[in-house]
Amino acid sequence: MSQPRPLLSPPETEEQLLAQAQQLSGYTLGELAALDGLVTPENLKRDKGWIGVLLEIWLGASAGSKPEQDFAALGVELKTIPVDSLGRPLETTFVCVARLTGNSGVTWETSHVRHKLKRVLWIPVEGERSIPLAQRRVGSPLLWSPNEEEDRQLREDWEELMDMIVLGQVERITARHGEYLQIRPKAANAKALTEAIGARGERILTLPRGFYLKKNFTSALLARHFLIQ
C-alpha cells in the first residue's frame, strides 16, 4: 500500500476530504508527523492543539483559527476527538467561543454554534495517557450532520445558555447547565478578561467562555455510527 501524502491545497469535494481522512486511519501520530517532516512532542502539555494542527496539514484545511469552518469551501468543520480503548470520548469537545455581548436578535439558526456543527468531520484518535503520543493511532473518520433530534437537543441547551448570558447571569453558568451543550471558561490565564452583561444590565469583566459538547452527546454520536453499523 502506498503511503498517503498531505493535501497541498484544500479538498474540492466532501468525497475527496473523506477519502484522504480514510487513508490516515490506522496510522500513528508519530508516523504521520514523520511523513511530513515534523517532530512529535513528548506530550500535549505545551502543544494542546498539536493533533488538530497535524491533521489539518494532512487534510488541507484552510481556516486556521478563523471563525469560519476548517474547510470553508465545503462548509465542513474538523473535530479530532480523543477516545479510550472502547471508542468512548475522553473529554468534552470545544465548539466555538461564546459571545457575551451583542446577542440581541441572534437565533439558533443564525448562531455560530450551529454554523460550526452543521457539517463535521469527526476523527477519533487514541487518547489514553498510557499510550505515548507518537504511538497513538488515528481512527476511522465520520462525516456528520445533526439529525432532527440532535438539532433539537442542541437548540434547547443553546437557548437556555444564551438566555442566561443575555439576562446578565453569565457568572452563574456552570458546566452542569445544558444537557448536551455546556459553557465554561476558556482562557489560558485568569487575567484574560472580556466584557459581559451583569445582573443589573451593567458592563462587567469576566473570563472568556466557550461552548463545548458534553461527552454524553459525542459518545452517543460515535456509538450510533461506529458500534451499531
Swiss-Prot record:
CDD domains in the record: MutH-like (cd00583)
Principal cellular location given in the protein's record: cytoplasm
SMART domains on file: MutH
Localization of this protein: Cytoplasm
Keyword presence, Hydrolase: yes
A GO molecular function held by the record: endonuclease activity
A Pfam family: MutH
Alphabetical keyword list: Cytoplasm, DNA damage, DNA repair, Endonuclease, Hydrolase, Nuclease
Endoplasmic reticulum among keywords: no
GO cellular component: cytoplasm
InterPro entries: DNA_mismatch_repair_MutH, DNA_rep_MutH/RE_typeII_Sau3AI, DNA_rep_MutH/T2_RE_sf, Restrct_endonuc-II-like
GO terms of biological process kind: DNA modification; mismatch repair
Superkingdom as given in the UniProt entry: Bacteria
NCBIfam families: mutH_TIGR, PRK05070.1
Family: Belongs to the MutH family.
Function: Sequence-specific endonuclease that cleaves unmethylated GATC sequences. It is involved in DNA mismatch repair.
Protein's name according to its UniProt entry: DNA mismatch repair protein MutH
Organism: Shigella flexneri serotype 5b (strain 8401)
Gene that produces this protein: mutH
